[in-house]
Amino acid sequence: MAEIQHLAICTKNNRRLARFYQLIFGLEESWNRFQNSPYAFYMSDGYINLNCLQIRPGSSYNRMVDGQEIMPDAGINHIGFTVKSVKDIEQRLSSLNPPVKLVASPQDGRYEEWRITDPDGTIFEIAEGGWEAGGPERLPAIRYVGIRSEDPERLASFYKSALPIREVNRVTDPTGEARAIFLSAGKTALGLLKKTSASKNGFERVGFQVGSIDEIKKRLHNAPPYLYPGEPEVSVMTAPSADPGKTLYLKDPDGNIVELSEEGWIA
């Protein structure tokens, strides 16, 4: 089984974003003693390693287009899977049509070893060594990541072929077309959600299993400051009935969707 153990959110203020997740969800800093970088701010729930990654010129996640460096937008940028055998993943990728090649990650002390691009152009990473996540495991904990796609079926087929993961649930419309396909990736579910007119392809949301949603509401109200003057208040909201996700969610200070659930996700 390939396990999601890493999530990176690109941001223009990594300290502020890390502060929010520490104050509201109790994530703790996870120190990477091998990577001397002010741009990667690693947080942990005891199982998942969350990188609040500073957007900057020269990042390996930037793209060159017509000679211009394009930096990523603020938002969820990529996930990382811990795998038992990179060689097995390489064989899986080579058997795809067309074949997909592993791309080596920069060797500067970061945890990931290889990068892969899915059919929608979304990056994910793999590593045999995994990501440092501290411990012990606890709640609140990241237990879900959601990706929007024009074709969830195609994307599900790719991930199930490229990685040792399996489908555990799906939501369909009256015609039988998939609105959401959920894959098991260790203790964390990967959701492939049908793109809507109001959304765009790529990573869209993260989900926290929490002991008490009321406690999260109290923390949002009583926590020390994590917003700047004039920024909108963060509050727990109810999702539209057509949304295939959980009923309750919030948006972090950067606008990322964070689903909330006491029962968790099937994984």
Predicted regions and their residues:
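Vicinal oxygen chelate
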Residues: 12-16, 71-120, 149-153, 206-257, ...
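Active-site beta-strand termini and strand-to-loop segments that position acidic
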Residues: 43-47, 116-119, 182-187, 250-253, ...
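N-terminal beta-strand motif that seeds the catalytic metal site of vicinal oxygen chelate
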Residues: 1-18, 76-79, 129-156, 168, ...
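Short, structured interface segments
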Residues: 115-134
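Conserved beta-strand in the GNAT
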Residues: 51-53, 115, 125, 191-193, ...
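Core segments of cupin and vicinal oxygen chelate
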Residues: 1-2, 8-57, 108, 146-190
